[in-house]
């Protein structure tokens, strides 16, 4: 099917939906909801299609005027200027139109659960987890997103074995999803007398937050253990059994939550993380079954995949998926100015999807 035929088919579908919604008495409640959703999704696409069609019509009209032997010289000259101007606009509008036709990730509008864990490198890796946590929370503040720490395990000297947080706001998952993977840091530890460069790593997992209504978990599939929470070094920090460990028996996923003093709050947070992990597990299975979508785009987001290196001596950050290097390490890590990386990753993702857009 040609590009223009695809647009015509979409337009016909849109106006058919519009007609149906104008007479909702003919629709069941479920059909009305489904039609309304599809209509809303097509509305911005139709707006760009109209813009594209008007531009094409203008170009055809100007071309006819230019080729008409009865057109006087002055009018023909003006028509040529207008024709070339419209021709320059056409590729941009066509590109905009193709972007609007790309399949949407239904999770993009969701909030996100961000999990940061120390990898290889001991205490240096734990300190890097803290650095990444600060970078992402600063970025969240810039975007006017809200964030809440879900769980953390500190090392007692400024580092963390792991930190997880929930970030909520507009298009959080859409902007953070490409942060999943292995982040590597190269720097000289303060305790290193010889000045030798150490390499450490941390893993980041970005999961869409799933509401209870979107994913039901059977209570029979859960084993819930409660115990006293502990701090750095294993010492008890609570005299009541407030810490919660939830095991999802079918998948083997285990979530531990002990930050809150209330057992009820710890259980609620643990279930929130469990839902996100189960949803992500199913999503990864679907992606692998369909077309290995993650690998065909920017990268799999797999934790074994090194995605970015932070070199402190050179104030350099390199994203290996898109070969982008920026020499603004403090600006990015301390102030959270991540947009240049994020925009480039989104653009790369769109470019790869466009290659697979068969129209």
From Swiss-Prot:
InterPro entries to which the protein is assigned, alphabetical:
PCRF (IPR005139), Pep_chain_release_fac_I (IPR000352), Pep_chain_release_fac_I_sf (IPR045853), Prokaryotic/Mito_RF (IPR050057), RF-1 (IPR004373)
Q: Pfam families per the record?
A: PCRF, RF-1
Q: Please give the chief subcellular localization of this protein.
A: cytoplasm
Q: GO CC annotation: what is one?
A: cytoplasm
Q: Which SUPFAM superfamilies match?
A: Release factor
SMART domains, alphabetized: PCRF
- PTM: Methylated by PrmC. Methylation increases the termination efficiency of RF1.
Protein function:
Peptide chain release factor 1 directs the termination of translation in response to the peptide chain termination codons UAG and UAA.
Identify this protein by name: Peptide chain release factor 1
| The organism of origin for this protein | Ehrlichia chaffeensis (strain ATCC CRL-10679 / Arkansas)
Give the encoding gene's name.
Answer: prfA
């Amino acid at each position: 099917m040609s590009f223009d035929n695809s647009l015509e088919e979409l337009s016909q579908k849109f106006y058919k939906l519009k007609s149906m919604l104008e007479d909702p008495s003919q629709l069941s409640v479920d059909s009305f909801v489904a039609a309304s959703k599809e209509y809303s999704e097509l509305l911005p696409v139709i707006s760009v299609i109209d813009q594209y069609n008007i531009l094409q019509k203008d170009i055809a009209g100007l071309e006819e005027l230019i080729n008409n032997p009865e057109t006087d010289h002055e009018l023909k000259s003006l028509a040529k200027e207008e024709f070339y101007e419209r021709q320059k606009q056409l590729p941009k509008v066509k590109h905009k139109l193709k972007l609007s036709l790309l399949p949407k990730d239904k999770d993009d509008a969701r909030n996100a659960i961000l999990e940061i864990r120390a990898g290889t490198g001991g205490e240096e890796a734990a300190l890097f987890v803290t650095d990444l946590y600060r970078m992402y929370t600063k970025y969240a503040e810039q975007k006017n997103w809200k964030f809440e720490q879900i769980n953390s395990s500190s090392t007692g000297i400024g580092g963390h074995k792991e930190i997880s947080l929930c970030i909520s706001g507009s298009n959080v998952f859409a902007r953070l999803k490409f942060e999943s993977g292995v982040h590597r840091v190269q720097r000289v530890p303060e305790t290193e007398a010889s000045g030798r460069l150490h390499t450490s790593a941390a893993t980041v997992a970005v999961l869409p937050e799933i509401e209870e209504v979107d994913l039901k978990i059977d209570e029979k599939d859960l084993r819930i253990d409660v115990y006293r929470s502990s701090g750095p070094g294993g010492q008890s920090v609570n005299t009541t059994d407030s810490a919660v460990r939830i095991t999802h028996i079918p998948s083997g996923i285990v979530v531990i939550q002990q930050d809150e003093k209330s057992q009820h709050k710890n259980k609620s947070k643990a279930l929130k993380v469990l839902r996100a992990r189960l949803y992500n597990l199913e999503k990864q299975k679907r992606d692998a079954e369909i077309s290995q979508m993650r690998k065909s785009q920017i990268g799999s987001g797999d934790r074994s995949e090194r995605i970015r290196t932070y070199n402190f001596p050179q104030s350099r950050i390199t994203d290996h998926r898109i070969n982008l290097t920026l020499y603004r390490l403090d600006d990015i890590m301390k102030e959270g100015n991540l947009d240049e990386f994020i925009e480039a990753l989104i653009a790369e993702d769109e470019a790869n999807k466009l290659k697979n857009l068969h129209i």
